[in-house]
Design a protein with these regions (language model features):
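Low-complexity, acidic Ser/Thr/Pro/Gly-rich terminal tails and inter-domain linkers that flank the onset
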Residues: 355-373
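Short, solvent-exposed loop/linker segments at the N-terminal edge
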Residues: 281-286, 369-378
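A general secondary-structure signal for short beta-strands and their flanking turns/coil
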Residues: 288, 333, 358, 375-377
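Beta-strand-rich structural segments
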Residues: 291-295, 375-389
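Edge beta-strands of extracellular beta-sandwich domains
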Residues: 344-356
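Extended substrate-binding grooves/exosites of carbohydrate-active enzymes
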Residues: 1-346
Length: 389
């Protein structure tokens, strides 16, 4: 993996532990005391010659963040990393809101925030000497191609029948939609950037359709944590959900809508526009069906069957800073087209069209030849086409 990251220019923070001495929801590392030094040595010696590795991480969301009598463990790990590789800094993923102030942050070279965009401003003011970044951000949840109505901007809504609406507005209690993290990063340039949870969906951790007590670690002890645990208990363990909804890309490698809000924000020079949702809603004729557009442009005009639905410009609010929204579009079969502009000039377009009845299947392999060794693979994308293709 690191060889690929070297070639592709992907920046890696090489993380060693998820648990130190203290157990995390019943899972512990009984061999930590005996093996932690050897583990640090082995990791450093294996990876220190990879240019993609920009820092070492000693842990992620460890309970010791909140235990002053155990902060020495973090300092020990930092010292070991420095001994084996004096060229790189050491960080840790911190989800304890107090860890930056209770002394734990002093044991790290670089502070990693998990899901605390609201804390960036004060951190930069209180600790100007210490670099920081978003070690885990967003945790927005969605299912590719699923949209539920009415569209509610409350991040705790949008869940139905083991799916999550793909308007990219929804997240667990500790998490946020991408727009919130984007704003925090831009408004606090002291932050080095963000690592999003997650790039791809994965098997397990099907939040919000599971009782995962580790979620409670993302909020402080007290009423807030008690409220979250009550919400999780109410949701329960709702099989058949078995994989995550966090990914920007789904389990098959297909891009979700959310891919395009990141593309628009991270690649401002790329001419792009993306419309959501799809435009096949026979049961919604005449009903309000909001349209969202992600674009690297700064304004756009939306057309439905050639009729303008109005111009939207990016602003400074949460609803219009990173997406353009037409709240009152009434569904009519046909074609949606968006024309995005930048600096007053046409920048990019996108269209979605109501499809007809299925007429054919097309198969597109990602390669036409594979080795006959029983191991090589070709992934085939199957598309259902109407008579117009």
């Amino acid at each position: 993996v690191r060889d690929l990251c070297d070639k592709m220019g992907i920046l890696v923070i090489d993380e060693l532990f998820d648990v130190w001495q203290c157990s995390k929801e019943g899972v512990n590392n009984e061999s930590f005391n005996e093996w932690h030094e050897r583990d640090v040595v082995n990791l450093c010696h294996r990876d220190r010659n990879h240019p993609c590795v920009i820092a070492w991480s000693s842990g992620n969301e460890v309970p010791e963040q909140g235990m002053k009598n155990l902060h020495h463990i973090s300092q020990t790990l930092t010292d070991l990393f420095h001994r084996e590789d004096p060229t790189r800094k050491v960080t840790s993923g911190c989800n304890n809101a107090n860890a930056a102030r209770n002394g734990f942050g002093d044991t790290l070279d670089v502070y990693g925030y998990n899901y605390k965009p609201w804390a960036y401003k004060d951190f930069a003011k209180d600790r100007p000497h210490q670099p920081f970044y978003g070690a885990e951000t967003a945790s927005c949840v969605s299912s590719r191609g699923e949209y539920f109505f009415p569209v509610d901007w409350n991040k705790g809504k949008g869940f139905y029948l083991y799916q999550v609406s793909s308007y990219d507005l929804y997240a667990p209690g500790w998490a946020n939609r991408p727009d919130v993290e984007f704003a925090a990063q831009e408004d606090n340039p002291n932050s080095a950037g963000e690592y999003v949870w997650t790039g791809f969906d994965y098997i397990g951790e099907p939040t919000p359709y599971n009782l995962d007590a580790t979620n409670a670690l993302n909020v402080p002890e007290g009423p807030e944590r008690e409220k979250l645990m009550a919400e999780l208990k109410k949701l329960g363990d709702r099989a058949p959900s078995r994989s995550s909804y966090f990914g920007i890309v789904d389990l098959c490698g297909f891009k979700k809508d959310r891919f395009y809000i990141y593309q628009a924000h991270w690649r401002p020079d790329l001419k792009m526009a993306h419309i959501l949702p799809h435009w096949n809603w026979p049961e919604r004729k005449g009903q309000v069906t909001p349209v969202h557009v992600y674009t690297s442009g700064d304004e756009a005009e939306l057309f439905l069957n050639g009729k303008s639905q109005g111009v939207r410009k990016k602003g400074t609010g949460e609803k219009d800073r990173y997406r353009l929204v037409w709240e009152d579009v009434k569904y009519t079969p046909g074609t949606l087209k968006v024309v995005a502009k930048k600096d007053g000039k046409i920048w990019a377009t996108d269209t979605v069209t109501t499809t007809g009845k299925p007429a054919a299947l097309t198969l597109k392999p990602d390669r036409n030849e594979i080795k006959g060794d029983g191991y090589d693979l070709s992934y085939v994308t199957v598309a259902v086409r109407d008579a117009q293709g």
